[in-house]
Amino acid sequence: MLEATERVKEDARAIISQIQNNGYVNPAIKPTDNKLTVIIPFLNEGEEVGRTVCSIRETVGNKVDIIVINDCSTDGYPYQKDLLPLNVYYIVNSKRQGVAASRDMGIGLSKTPYFLLLDGHMRFYDSQWCEYIVNLLTENDRRLLCTQGRYLEKVDGVVREIASRTYKSYGAYMPLIKGHTLTEIVWKGNEYAPEADTEPIPVVLGAGYAASKRYWNHLRGLEGLRYYGNDEAYISMKVWMEGGECVLLKKVVVGHIYRKKSPYKRYSADELFNELLISYLLFPQSLWCVEFATLCKTNRDLFLMALEKFQEESKRWVALREYYRRNFTKTFRDFTEVQQRLCSQFLEDFKKKDIDVKGIAQFVSEKPLEEKGLFDGTMGQILWLCIYENSSEDHTYKDHIKALWDGVAAAVHHKKFPCNFSNGLAGIGWGLIFLKEHNMIEDDISEELNLIDRQLSCYAIQKDKDLSLATGTGGILAYATARKMYGIKNHIPAEWIDDNEEMLMKAAQMVIDESSELNALVYAMRYIALCRDGYDEQDYPINLGDWMDVKDFIPKNPRRWTSVLTDTTLTTSTLYLIYHKKLNRHGKIQ
């Protein structure tokens, strides 16, 4: 009842505001000789809208067209009065559309080949910025340009630089940290090309973005986003995946007044919807399932509301995803390579680490484990030693690895294992597929997988109340997902999976409905997506990071080391070995 009352009040304020701001829904925008249109959507900005436009006119005069879009403000401020003498096209949305839709609308209405998107609280400082932007886009219009920000605040009506903001930023990037929202972006602190006036950046941020109308339409703009949130991540990834580039203009400095509070509702089902949509459209299958699972774990009620909205237009999103796959020349994996190249903070820390991986390898080889499984047994040691060998090209332990595997294989043949993932058949099977997928073993593994399948066929998954990855349904689904993917890619049928697909699907849905464990949720969603949508050719091979918690600590005293895969010594050194290989490839360390 309270929410309904608030909606009525909001609608009333919107009607009053529209009466006070008699703009146009579809104004007739006349072509000019200008090359650039500035587009400013806003909501409840007060005097700042007019001051932003004044700053534009004071620096470049009438060299740009300006479209100002009032997204159904409710503050009663007389915007039209401020804007009337400033030669702008002023539009009032009769219903709130949100930032993304308002930006796309403004671009659609513009008559110039290029445009600049701004917020309604910005300042300009020189008279060359328009010509500079136009020249860069004329030279190459497969670009999204980002202005350099000056961080401002407004205190008692006075606009000033934020004194505490002493560091510079150079665009943004996506950390892509499991357990966090994968579409989240953060400021990038390192400068990639200090000697240049421009430099490529992974993601634009700061609310000053320029592009060509032709290219924006080819990318389908911000299509699908609701109200507020994630514009920058969405459009930046699309630019890089299409084959274009995001570029920071260090010479074009634009002041941005950072507000204490957003006028748009934050952390709503609509914002979660945007995160679901972007991940589904642009991420490979395994990663969008991680994003869905993370949002489900974080706030299940809000996730279910967002998911319902998403599923209402599922056919539209499938078609849009297919459009991107047809028209983009790069993949999400290529985008992450761009990030690693441009963001030294991703990899430079590993330069400074002094991890005795040779010593750890010797330690592991000398510490046999009684258990045979993946988490704290021999299979985990085999995986670590194979990763070490693959990264370091040190083949000292080749015979030792074979001997370890012979012991595990013998135990599998003698049916001495539980079915679970942590210390049983599911984990051993997953480990075998991992080694084969990453070309760390040459032997055919079909016999071992078929044997594991036959033993797992006796497991009553639908009766198991344990939904966890380690010892329950989540772990069986982890193996089933890897097994099905391996079978599809290598044209090898997985009869246990095919014969029990309905039962496994029901088990996966039970995990989604009842579990709060991230890894279990991820594999439940991955299994359902794989069965429903098929294998994604752009997906990653299975990896330890799919389920292993990343740690960054190794005891200095070797007496405190352990040879268990899931303990800090091996998880940290595994991360180091993987990134050491990437650092070498990017020329960062030798």
Q: What feature does the model see in each segment?
A:
Residues 115:
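Short aromatic/hydrophobic "clamp" motif used to bind/position activated sugar donors
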Residues 78, 94-109:
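Glycine-rich, basic loop-to-helix element that forms the pyrophosphate-binding segment
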Residues 100, 182-210, 269-270:
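A recurrent flexible, glycine/aromatic-enriched loop bordering the glycosyltransferase active site
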Residues 70-79, 123:
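A conserved acidic beta->alpha catalytic loop
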